A protein has these predicted regions:
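N-terminal low-complexity, acidic/polar interaction/targeting segments
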Residues: 1-201
Length: 201
């Protein structure tokens, strides 16, 4: 299915079902969000590049308007919905619009062993980073997005995950990524603990 979608380029990767708070202050995006609110339509969140945007993005629906400021600025919360691929960009408005094609995952499920490993590693990373523990829904068909969206991972890696059309591939990629970053995290925590204990690193 294809559609014409207004785009909001950001230095972020939005996943399906992920919540994202936004502060809208630029006139062109105040106009865009105003139209989306009036028409109850989604917009596309795409990762901004130097002179362009990423080819793969995620549509976003406005879930809540937290505050409308007197100068027209907005504080909103959006939720990721469907992934899309940009087919062409339209520059007729003050903000970008794009012809997009939505896509879903290919059939297939995660291996239970990959899920168990990913959830265990994720919990350790959250603990090392001092984050709040949460219980992921291991029956979620796109569990990889839930796990990746809860951590401040490398944006290039998140962008790669967003474009993969296999949940199994994403989960395997997550396990490999978690295993790669954990040694440095463990060392960093030990250094901090040692410094806090005796005043020396």
């Amino acid at each position: 299915m294809s559609a014409l979608l207004p785009l909001f380029p950001l230095d972020v990767v939005l996943f399906p079902d992920m919540s994202l708070p936004l502060h809208i202050f630029e006139p062109r995006y105040k106009e865009m969000i105003g139209e989306c609110l009036a028409d109850k339509t989604p917009f596309g969140v795409v990762r901004a590049k130097k002179n362009s945007v990423a080819e793969i993005g995620c549509s976003a629906e406005i879930a809540n308007v937290i505050k409308k400021h007197e100068d027209g600025k907005l504080d909103i919360v959006v939720e990721g919905r469907q992934r899309f691929q940009i087919r062409g960009v339209n520059h007729d408005r003050s903000f970008l619009k794009a012809e997009v094609s939505y896509f879903e995952d290919e059939p297939g499920a995660n291996k239970p062993s990959d899920v168990t490993r990913a959830v265990k590693l994720h919990a350790e990373i959250v603990g090392l980073m001092g984050g709040e523990a949460f219980a992921p829904d291991v029956q979620e068909p796109q569990l990889s997005f839930q796990l990746a969206g809860a951590l401040p991972l490398d944006l290039d890696f998140k962008q790669t995950l967003l474009g993969l059309r296999s949940e199994s591939e994403r989960m395997i990629g997550l396990v490999e990524y978690f295993e790669a970053i954990l040694p440095n995290l463990r060392r960093a925590v030990k250094v901090r603990q040692k410094a806090g204990g005796n005043g020396h690193a």
